[in-house]
Amino acid sequence: MILTENLNVLWASVLFETLYRLGLRTVVLSPGSRSGPLAIAAAAHPHLEALPILDERSAAFFALGLVQQQGRPVALLCTSGTAAANFYPAIIEASLSHLPLIVLSADRPPELRFCQAGQAIDQVHLYGHAVRHYRELSLPELPLLPYLRQTLCHSWQTALWPDPGPVHLNIPLRDPLDLRSQANFHGELPKGFFDQVQPFVPPRVVTSLPWQTWQQMQRGLIIAGPSHGVDPLAEAAAIDRLSRFLQWPVLADALSSARGLPHGISHYDLLLRDAHLREYLRPEAVIQLGPLPTSKALREWLSACDPLIWCLDPTGDNNNPLHGRCQMLAIAPQAVDCPPDPLPPNPYLKDWQDQDQRVREQLKRTFEAIDWFSEVKLIYHLPQWLPSQTAIFVASSMPVRDVESVWQGSDRRHRFYFNRGANGIDGTLSTALGVAHRGQPTLLITGDLACLHDTNGWLITPQFQGCLTVLLINNRGGGIFEHLPIRQFDPPFEAFFATPQQVDFSYLAAAYGIPYHCLKDWADVEAQLRQTPWPKIRLLEFRSDRHRNAQWRQQVLAHLGG
């Protein structure tokens, strides 16, 4: 449907029709005047879902969640001025996580900039190097509609290939900014105007791999970082084929699709805290898939061992924070074609599996003896208690580290989502809502500070269609700081690092009309989590003692691997 009341709405209509034909299905927009024609066109398009969200920062992270869930670009629209600046944190996350995002910022025309006209800032290259591509569109003109179409096609392609990420289109508009008819205006498109607008298909890149070298290695590892791919099952199957052929163990981040594979080692983070095992399990070669896992113990061990590393990653990122002996190979795991016949069984693989099983049994005995509200025990039991195919969004900071340490793979096909590009806590709730919107029933695991940092996310509730359970681990402060050397210095530790908040979450939930439940004991925790999915949104509060949990991690968990 092309609107033709005036030049601006025609321009905006052509913009969204072009993006729709390229593959766009969702537009997330925040209200404003200068973006009026664009909002009108998005809302009027019969095949686009247009979602109005008040707060721009929350809207941008919600869009990131949608991109992760849908596996395709989402458009993000705002008016001129500081509105666009509020998109910046999410754009940084999209850039570092290789998530394609189409950022559309309306702007004042050139004659209303730098003259105190109001609601005008310098939006040219506003996001700097965080975007893959920037274009300022011309002011709307009928003869320039083919230029608009081609600019959009190129921008869409750049968002997807060769390195997926955000692109920014700055769109200046003069009045009228509404549906008023324009005198003597006849906006008709030529026949077949959209005929060549087709979804972009990235080319397949073939990279030769050092199979002969790998087959000669007796102590090889596959290390899989967090999965940013849109098809985790295909990625997991590819990693499984590679590990079965080479007979190498797989050390997979809990946020990877490969955690729980037959050759997978779930508890490497605990094993590598033991000095004897660090030497006993020393590798000579590593195939690294994407970025390194979160585990500090793993990173320190690899740095000390200095094995030969081949990093497989199609994005071209420098995934070598240890500055080791690493060769970069621009290929995704799914594109690896393994030779047909697997190698003989490898004693190095069995060593890893035996140690992993020993720790698995030790964890089971340890948690059976705990009756107090242990945050790590909560994470340990989630794979058993959550229904099959639950999507899980894990907040940064302490939750993701506990997941890394004790999450055991299962056959329930849980899929993880996360914001691990910049590793910030901002936008946690909003991103989780985006993941759950019209998607799988979702569980958000978050601490109290991450949840409070994004309370405007609750404003999305009226537009939200889906099932989200927020599992709030409330230890009244930043639990991760308890594990840093600064903990020994109080003051200033408690006030300036732990930053405890005194919010009653039952009142916060009531203010937004969110069902709330404070978990009472372990039987209650299990019963509530087995009820997932829950209609719409609910908040479960797990109250824990920050100091006791930190002390237990340091005195007990850290020594379970030995």
From Swiss-Prot:
A GO molecular-function annotation: manganese ion binding
EC number: 2.2.1.9
SUPFAM superfamilies: Thiamin diphosphate-binding fold (THDP-binding)
GO biological process: menaquinone biosynthetic process; phylloquinone biosynthetic process
Cofactor requirement: Mg(2+); Mn(2+); thiamine diphosphate
UniProt catalytic activity: isochorismate + 2-oxoglutarate + H(+) = 5-enolpyruvoyl-6-hydroxy-2-succinyl-cyclohex-3-ene-1-carboxylate + CO2
Matches recorded under CDD domains: TPP_PYR_MenD (cd07037), TPP_SHCHC_synthase (cd02009)
Pathway: Quinol/quinone metabolism; 1,4-dihydroxy-2-naphthoate biosynthesis; 1,4-dihydroxy-2-naphthoate from chorismate: step 2/7; Cofactor biosynthesis; phylloquinone biosynthesis
Keywords assigned by UniProt, alphabetized: Magnesium, Manganese, Metal-binding, Thiamine pyrophosphate, Transferase
Cofactor: how and how many bound: Binds 1 thiamine pyrophosphate per subunit.
Secretion signal, residue range per the UniProt entry: none
Pfam family for this entry, one: TPP_enzyme_M_2
NCBIfam families found in the cross-reference section: menD
Family recorded in the similarity comment: Belongs to the TPP enzyme family. MenD subfamily.
Subunit structure: Homodimer.
Purpose of the protein: Catalyzes the thiamine diphosphate-dependent decarboxylation of 2-oxoglutarate and the subsequent addition of the resulting succinic semialdehyde-thiamine pyrophosphate anion to isochorismate to yield 2-succinyl-5-enolpyruvyl-6-hydroxy-3-cyclohexene-1-carboxylate (SEPHCHC).
Classification via HAMAP family: MenD (MF_01659)
Name the UniProt record assigns to this protein: 2-succinyl-5-enolpyruvyl-6-hydroxy-3-cyclohexene-1-carboxylate synthase
Organism: Thermosynechococcus vestitus (strain NIES-2133 / IAM M-273 / BP-1)
Record gene name: menD
